[in-house]
Regions:
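One-carbon transfer enzymes
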Residues: 1-124
Length: 124
């Protein structure tokens, strides 16, 4: 049975996970990533590795400033079976975790709780 999946991720670590979902028999409903950020002296706008990868695959990306009521309603309408989170970089609000018939799975880059935090790969 194919699952209906929403993916939430941002850095390089998340790209192979997203690619695995795309290449599976499951149905990818949406991709969420952090919004583009200004960096460097020229204040160039940089998109996340997940956004760049999705753009290459011609898949639309959602990058809201906040996971608010509008996003919750959008997700509810998609009716996913599962939401896969891989280093998204935002805290998922508790009310999202209660969306009916939707489960969440978090893929972490290191062993928890020993290597928790913002830079688990570097610390491990």
């Amino acid at each position: 049975m194919a699952l209906r999946i929403i993916f939430m991720g941002t850095p390089d670590f998340a790209v192979p996970i997203l690619n695995s979902i795309i290449n599976s028999q499951h149905r990818l409903l949406a991709i969420y990533t952090q919004n583009p950020k200004k960096s460097d002296r020229g204040q160039k706008i940089n998109i996340s590795p997940v956004h760049y990868f999705a753009k290459e695959k011609k898949i639309e990306v959602r990058s809201p400033k906040d996971l608010n009521l509008e996003e919750k309603i959008f997700i509810q309408k998609l009716n996913p079976d599962i939401i896969v989170v891989a280093a998204y970089g935002k805290i998922i609000p508790p009310e999202f975790l209660k969306i009916k018939n939707t489960k969440f799975i978090n893929i972490h880059a290191s062993l928890l709780p020993k290597w928790r935090g913002a830079a688990p790969i570097q610390r491990s």
